[in-house]
Regions:
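Rossmann-like AdoMet
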Residues: 1-64
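S-adenosylmethionine/decaboxylated-SAM
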Residues: 59-240
């Protein structure tokens, strides 16, 4: 029996849908769903995934992502092809390993991942493979202190949140790093189910037509957004 890609199917249906005023909603990022799905499938069946899951099991699963979310993060990074990435909550480097693997697979040899971890007692970035470390910039500090200083790039291509999931802290990180993203920059977050912070942040970027009460794409401040597993993401649309 042929397999049906439910994710792609749902978005094909969306692509054919028009609002009541007859104007098609722009779907310039429609193709990303097939590409992200393909990248995620590739990494899930790869020796790298098997190796990282073995490392995770030996080290302890606490505070690390499961395979689905790792594959999603890897796939989003490959799709985005960022030159500068910032992640918070770097911890023992499990998520960093998948970001760095995506950069390597896209042959982005000059790209850099700034990984921030405030916990002084964990084994920082212990799970990052040696061959992926050259593109890692480890930062042991509170993100608030780094944001006030000049140690972080003012312009970035991708941000990944996985530090404290307290509501107000998530809100603050989203605002702080959203402003550093340019047009088509990617903001992603783990554990978006923990609070309403991500859902609210997405909602705040929407604009609606007063007459039709449908999406006003020109005034909306994102190109696309979604959730896959426990990772949510947004692609920024800068003001014209």
């Amino acid at each position: 029996m042929a397999k049906i890609d439910l994710l792609s199917l749902s978005w094909r249906r969306r692509k054919s849908t028009k609002p009541s005023n007859g104007e098609a909603i722009p779907l310039s990022f429609y193709e990303m769903w097939d590409r992200v799905s393909q990248f995620a499938a590739e990494i899930r069946g790869s020796p790298f995934m098997s190796e990282m899951m073995e490392r995770r099991a030996k080290f302890g699963k606490g505070g690390t992502m499961a395979a689905l979310d790792c594959a999603t993060l890897y796939a989003l990074t490959r799709f985005q092809r960022p030159k500068i990435v910032i992640e918070t909550g770097g911890f023992i480097g499990f998520s960093a390993a998948f970001i760095l693997k995506a950069l390597a697979d896209e042959k982005l040899t000059t790209a850099r991942l700034y990984s921030i971890e405030a916990d002084e007692h964990c084994e920082h970035w212990a799970l990052v493979p040696d061959d992926l470390r050259p593109q890692l910039v480890p930062l042991r500090s509170k993100v608030e202190e780094l944001a006030r200083g000049d140690q972080l790039p003012s312009t970035i291509d991708m941000f990944f949140h996985d530090s404290s999931h307290r509501y107000r802290h998530m809100q603050w990180e989203f605002r702080e790093f959203w402003r550093r993203l340019g047009d088509r920059g990617l903001l992603a977050s783990h554990d978006v189910n923990m609070t309403r912070a991500f859902a609210e942040f997405v909602a705040d970027t929407y604009a609606h037509d007063k007459r039709t009460e449908l999406l006003d794409y020109d005034r909306t401040r994102h190109h696309e957004w979604g959730r896959w597993g426990y990772i949510g993401f947004m692609i920024k649309k800068a003001a014209a």
